[in-house]
Amino acid sequence: YPLTVTDQLGREVTIETEPKTLASGYYISTSLLIALGVQDELVGVEAKADKRTLYSLSAPELQSLPSIGTAKEFDLEGCAALTPDLVIVPAKLKDSIPQMEEMGLTVLAVKPENQAGLFGAIELLAQATNTTARGEELEMAIESNLAALAEAVAGTDAPSVYLAGNSSVLETAGRAMYQNTM
């Protein structure tokens, strides 16, 4: 450190010192930070963290952290008040990033909406949090699981599947979302 990385919006971001406190405004980035083993560095997480089963099983302490909102209603002031060394947000918050930076926050945007994007997010977050070895292990585990799954279903007819949305059974993942790759 200082370390310059390129986030998933193509922005060059310089992280001046190794981040010791993180804020994640996106459940996918929060989940990846757990997988990278840096959940203890989180000081703020996305809304509804207290309802996520994954967190209750893998990092229950996250359920009591302050909420920094959602991609639709991000709490800029609340996030800034936590003084995180690094903030991770979904790419859809790109219009809010300049304001966050004006508030003195270092911000990375992630867009893990397909397999390449997921691996890019893992690599970006692993690099930013100095956990590249763990990031490589995580990618290899995912690749291994996907290969085993492909082998297990080889030669079978793929069924039509409707994946109900998180908020409503009448909503589903669009073509640009990771879930559509399943």
Residue ranges and their predicted role:
Residues T172-M182:
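Alpha-helical, coiled-coil/dimerization segments enriched in small aliphatic residues
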Residues S24-L82, L86-K92:
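A short, structured surface patch at a secondary-structure boundary
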Residues I15-T17, G37, P60-E61, A80-A81, ...:
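Extracellular/periplasmic catalytic domains that process cell-envelope and extracellular macromolecules
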Residues E12, S96-A173:
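Extracytoplasmic substrate-binding proteins
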Residues Y1-E16:
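N-terminal hydrophobic or amphipathic helices and topogenic motifs
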Residues S58-A59, I122-A126, Y178:
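Short, surface-exposed amphipathic charged segments that create phosphate/polyanion-binding patches used
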Residues T21-G25, V161:
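Short periplasmic/luminal acceptor-recognition loop of GT-C membrane glycosyltransferases, typified by
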Residues L9, E46, G69-A71, K111, ...:
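Residues at the C-termini of beta-strands that transition into short coil/loop
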